[in-house]
Amino acid sequence: MISVNDFKTGLTVEVDNDIWQVIEFQHVKPGKGAAFVRSKLRNLRSGNIQEKTFRAGEKVSKAHIENRKMQYLYASGDAHAFMDTNTYDQIEIQGKQIQEQLKFIKENMEVSIVSYENEILGVDLPNNVELTVTETEPGIKGDTASGGSKPATLETGLIVQVPFFINEGDVLVINTSDGKYVSRA
């Protein structure tokens, strides 16, 4: 058990028989009445975000999340195969479970699989990934000074806005939290 006064961003807790990750929290001490902790939590099973308020000092169970380094192998229909890099065990995860992360995952990429009591909750991605441009309009000479952008399709099917000087075949660094172009690799 852990006190809500000890909340930290990223902490995983068990509340109402579900697994939640603390996104934001704030200790509130009103002039009148008891102190409380206002928090914003993400459900690790469904991905939903919910605001919850706890009385100061209230206890919740800490969820012991396991992170395993795994390598993405291939997709077979809607199932996606991953291999543990230490034991070489393979697991399959359904596409609907990791739909948002699939836009950033390519074959042979190492990711962290998040699980709780042998139940797979999702995939943790690195902050940035390198992806190759498969389709974009050619840059027109003189456009580089205007500072505009154009759409580019990447090898995973993700479409991002990139500067005019980016061409097909370029390798780009993409931020996985917002899906935006960072730089050329």
UniProtKB/Swiss-Prot annotation:
Per UniProt, which keywords does this protein have?
Cytoplasm, Elongation factor, Protein biosynthesis
Give the GO biological process terms. peptide biosynthetic process
Q: What subcellular compartments does it reside in?
A: Cytoplasm
Pathway-wise, it operates in:
Protein biosynthesis; polypeptide chain elongation
**GO terms, molecular function:** translation elongation factor activity
Residues in the signal sequence: none
Q: Can you list the GO cellular component terms from the UniProt entry?
A: cytoplasm
Short name of one Pfam family for this protein? Elong-fact-P_C
The record's function comment reads: Involved in peptide bond synthesis. Stimulates efficient translation and peptide-bond synthesis on native or reconstituted 70S ribosomes in vitro. Probably functions indirectly by altering the affinity of the ribosome for aminoacyl-tRNA, thus increasing their reactivity as acceptors for peptidyl transferase.
Family from the record:
Belongs to the elongation factor P family.
Could you identify this protein by its name?
A: Elongation factor P
